[in-house]
Amino acid sequence: DTHETFVTTNLRVIMEMFPDELEQLVNIHGVSWDPRFERRITVHFTTDRGVSAEANRHRANSPMESSTRYCNFSKGKFENQITICVPEEINDQQLKDHETSSVDISENIILPHDTSDWCDIDWWIWGNSCTELAYMKLLECGWTPQRARRILPLDLKTELIHTATVSDWKHFFDLRVLGTTGAPHPDMYEVAKPLYDEFQRRGYL
């Protein structure tokens, strides 16, 4: 009887880690092939978890992201607080104007006074402050970080590292900068556009 064996794997990893073994397999079975080696580029993003969710949809890339499962934001390493990324639509001056706003970041945070004069930025600050307070209180109640993280906001800062070939980065830019399939998410665009410009400057595109 004739038997055929099929091996499915990540060829990119095999070529990097076991090139001699791969060549031996090809020679033994008489397979004719023409390997292509394409430049791979690693990029480190500092962004929010909403943007990282968009970026991580590019599954051809090799992504790594900081974990909220084991990070305890009540510890000194994180200065006992969560870190929030400011959305693209809020500029620095607007945020500065609200540094001493009427938003009361305290345990009386549940609408402690009249909010009729609040604007969208007040509500945004208030919402994230409520989330931080609830997260810390859940930890005090004995919840583990991996349970308490369920209520962390999409504005939460994250570190994201992506490694991809130039062709995969081109696909990334098609969607996240050039909008070939529809308008890019505005926060994703703000992250991706400077990278796109840098790739062009270096002649990668």
Q: Which residues does each predicted region cover?
A:
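Family-specific signature for flavin-dependent thymidylate synthase
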Residues: 1-205
